Swiss-Prot record:
This is Acyl-coenzyme A diphosphatase YFT2. Fatty acyl-coenzyme A (CoA) diphosphatase that hydrolyzes fatty acyl-CoA to yield acyl-4'-phosphopantetheine and adenosine 3',5'-bisphosphate. Preferentially hydrolyzes unsaturated long-chain acyl-CoA substrates in the endoplasmic reticulum (ER) lumen. This catalytic activity is required for maintaining ER structure and for lipid droplets (LDs) biogenesis, which are lipid storage organelles involved in maintaining lipid and energy homeostasis. May directly bind to diacylglycerol (DAGs) and triacylglycerol, which is also important for LD biogenesis. Belongs to the FIT family. Yeast FIT2A/YFT2 subfamily. The active site is at residues 178, 239. GO terms for cellular component: endoplasmic reticulum; endoplasmic reticulum lumen; endoplasmic reticulum membrane; vacuole. It is found in: Endoplasmic reticulum membrane; Vacuole. Residues 1-11, 82-124, 192-215, 269-274 are cytoplasmic.
Length: 274
């Protein structure tokens, strides 16, 4: 399972652009009348379908559970992997000095591992919400600036508030919030799965991967697959091609910053990474 996770998590970034490409292709090949008819007659293609409501609209409530489950696994496995960094004494002549060194240094090392990784994941968690907030501020304001408005008549500038008022975005250039949001939170989980599976392989810690670890990983993967299915509907039946392309591209801003830019900021590296 770990090896398969390592492989698929490395390829995950290709899934979402491929979905946009296929959706764009189908929107050219299949008439809009056919697509609209399918969307109106099939319950699973409507934005109000149960999967979309639970796994997309409520994803912000679900995602922290998945993220912190993977964070716990990362911290636990890093902790176990470093338990043997400081060797125990192997002879009686070494007992007094070596054992004293071990007992003095191990608590410090243990505390450093835990504190650094907790700080790292707290930083990732905050950055996810901050960057997505900025993304959606941009998306919503572009929509308003290009003549869009909420059908509820409330003059709100937030797509989320418009939905809660049972309104719909009308007019305007509507960058796909579904793609931006689901790609962002999915890629963060994919990156965590990749880091975890790579670490387990590098440290040869397959023996620690018990049924509970596998169950946790399976739940995360199942939700990721559901999000991919939801995005297939968005890619084929909703938004213009450019709106989907921009939504997908904006979805990569958050994970790229967290996993590729943040680790290269020297002043923060010693505080966030082992």
């Amino acid at each position: 399972m770990i090896r398969q996770l390592n492989y698929w998590s490395r390829k995950a970034y290709l899934i979402y652009p491929f979905q946009v490409f296929v959706g764009a292709l189908l929107s050219i090949v299949v008439s809009s009348e056919t697509l609209n008819h399918q969307k109106e007659t099939c319950a699973l293609l409507k934005s109000s379908n149960i999967f979309n409501v639970i796994f997309a609209y409520k994803a912000n409530q679900l995602w922290p559970f998945l993220f912190f489950s993977l964070a716990f696994l990362q911290i636990y496995f890093h902790y176990l992997a470093r338990m043997d960094i400081l060797p125990l004494p192997i002879s009686s002549t070494e007992t007094s000095s070596s054992y004293l060194t071990y007992t003095n240094h191990w608590p410090l090392l243990k505390n450093r591992i835990i504190s650094i990784m907790i700080t790292q994941y707290a930083c990732k968690f905050v950055l996810k919400y901050l960057l997505l907030f900025l993304n959606f501020q941009f998306i919503d304001h572009v929509f308003i600036w290009t003549g869009g408005e909420c059908s509820s008549g409330s003059k709100t500038t937030s797509a989320e508030k418009c939905r809660l008022e049972n309104g719909k975005w009308d007019g305007g250039f509507d960058i796909s919030g579904h793609f931006c949001f689901l790609v962002s939170i999915s890629m963060i989980l994919w990156m965590e799965l990749h880091l975890f599976s790579r670490f387990v392989q590098a440290e040869d810690m397959f023996w620690v991967v018990n049924k509970w670890v596998r169950a946790c990983l399976a739940i995360v993967c199942a939700v990721l697959v559901i999000w991919i299915c939801i995005l297939w509907v968005t890619a084929i039946y909703y938004h213009t091609i450019l709106e989907k392309v921009l939504g997908c591209l904006m979805g990569f801003i958050c994970p790229v910053f967290i996993y590729h830019i943040l680790p290269k900021i020297g002043i923060l590296h010693n505080y966030l990474y082992l």
